[in-house]
Amino acid sequence: MSDKLPMAVIGTGHFGTYHAQKIAASEQAELVAVADIDLARAEAVGERLGVPAVSDFRELFGKIDAASVTVPTQAHFDVARECLERGIHVLVEKPITDGLATADALVELANNRECILQVGHLVRFSGVAEALRRHVTRPLYIDSVRIAPFSGRSTDVNVVLDLMIHDIDLVLSLVDSPILAFDAAGAPVFTDHEDICTARIKFANGCIATITASRISFKTERRMRIFQPSSYLSVNFDSQSLSIARRAGDGVSATAVDIREESYEEVDALEREIGAFIACVREGRRPIVSGEEGRRALEAALIATRELQAHTRFVMEVSSDQGLARKVGS
C-alpha cells in the first residue's frame, strides 16, 4: 500500500461533495476521482478539487483501495456490494442500506472479503459524544431532541431515516441491552413522508429512551439528557457542552448536588470520521461504527418507521371518517 490510501467518492450530491473535500485535503489519503451518474455534477466537483470525474464508478476498479459511498440510500447496497466484491473498503453514508436483508448481505460480504465496512453515523465523532460515553454508566432514562428547519434534502425518506437514526445509533451505543418494545408517532407536514416523529424505546434492562426528531422547525436544536443512578447528564450538541449533576452527599436525605460544566472544542466530525476509516483500513481494526452497528441502528429505525406509518394511517382514517360524518350530518 502506498503512503496515501487511494480513495474515490461515489455520489457527488450534498454530502458526497463534503466527503470529496475532506479526502482531498487529507494527508493520509489520495482522492483519485469522483463518480456520479450525473457526469456534469461530478465534473463540477472534480474540477474544483483537481481530480478526474466519471459517470460509472466501475471505471475506478483497480485504481482505488477504498471508497466513500454517498449515493441515495436506495443505491447504497448495489454500489457498496460491487466495491466490496472487488476488495475495496467502504465508508457508506447512513443508513447502511434501506432494508435488513441487504444490510446483512453487506456485513457478510465485508467479513468474507476481509474488508472494512464503516457506516457514516457522524454524531459519534463529535468531541462531546466521545466524552458522553466516558460518563455514562447505567442509563435509566434518556431524552433526546433533534430538530431543524426544513432544508428540502433527503425528502425521499421519513425523518426517522433522515435525522432520528443518528440519535437511535447513539442511544444504542450507550445502552447495552436488547430492545424490548418500541412505539412511535408523528406526521407528514411538508413532504409525502413523516417529517416529525417521537419514538419511545423500552430496553430489556429497564432503560427507557424517548427520541424526538423534526425537520420542520424554526430553529436548530440538538440535545440529549441521560438520567442514571446518582447522576444526570445534559448534552448540547450545538454548543458541544456537557453538564453533569451528581449527588454530593451520602444517604437518602442528602440534598447537596455537585454540578460540573464541560465544554469541548468544535471539531470537524466528518474529517474525524474519514480519518478513523482510513486508520481502520491501514491497521485492519474494527470501525467505531461497524457494519453490524449500522445494521442494528437500521433495524431500530425500521421498527420506528413501521410504528410511525401505522400511526399515520390511523390518523388519516380517523380524519377521513370524521369528515364523512360531518358531511352526512350537514
Feature locations, PLM:
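Contiguous beta-strand/loop segments that form the cofactor/metal-binding neighborhood of enzyme cores
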Residues: 168-241, 271-285, 321-330
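Mid-domain beta-loop-alpha active-site segment that forms a flexible
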Residues: 120-127, 150-181, 293-294
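Beta-loop-alpha module in the N-terminal Rossmann-like domain of NAD(P)-dependent dehydrogenases
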Residues: 19, 49-107
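N-terminal Rossmann-like dinucleotide-binding module
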Residues: 1-49, 171
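A contiguous active-site-proximal alpha/beta segment in oxidoreductase catalytic domains
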Residues: 97-154
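C-terminal helix-rich "cap/oligomerization" subdomain common to oxidoreductases
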Residues: 1, 66-68, 276-330
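Active-site loop of classical SDR/Rossmann-like NAD(P)-dependent oxidoreductases
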Residues: 37, 261-275, 289
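Hydrophobic residues in well-ordered beta-strands that form the structural core
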Residues: 55, 92, 117-119, 143, ...
